[in-house]
Amino acid sequence: MKCPFCGSMDTRVLDSRPTLDGTAIRRRRECSSCGKRFTTYERYEEAPVLVVKKDGRREKFDREKIKNGMIKACEKRPVTYEQIEEAVNRICLKLREEGSFEVETKRIGELVMEELKKLDQVAYVRFASVYRDFREVDQFLEIVKELKREKEGEEQ
């Protein structure tokens, strides 16, 4: 495996373990040339899934888009990269279990929001504001009230 820091091909695996949901192998590696450590994930290749956009266009499913959106929502929040990676794995697993070769962006957005709600409420509101295209302050207030109602319901 090529080192992302110095480009050397001389790296070794320090630790290998399956992810919590079992869909990937997480490997901790060390470069023999520069000594830096990095993490890689090994996944099986799946049949291509197409994402149906709002305007009807179709494009190949890209888990990196989901991960990047979640990273953006979790920016400056106490959420680790590993937590985001596991959430993305759960989203991909749910989509795979649903068994469709086409999935609407709406479904992906709902799954991302479910995961973010569990991880961090501020990240959830950030993502919701973009995903639901908030244009008014009242829309933010409504989603915050919804979170508060859910939290109060859990405490009872």
UniProtKB/Swiss-Prot annotation:
Co-factor binding details: Binds 1 zinc ion.
A Gene Ontology molecular function term of the record: DNA binding
The organism's place on the tree of life at top rank: Bacteria
Zinc finger (unnamed): 3-34
PROSITE patterns: ATP_CONE
A Pfam family it matches: Zn_ribbon_NrdR
Keyword ATP-binding listed: yes
Family that this chain belongs to: Belongs to the NrdR family.
Function of the molecule: Negatively regulates transcription of bacterial ribonucleotide reductase nrd genes and operons by binding to NrdR-boxes.
Protein name as it appears in the record: Transcriptional repressor NrdR
Record organism: Thermotoga petrophila (strain ATCC BAA-488 / DSM 13995 / JCM 10881 / RKU-1)
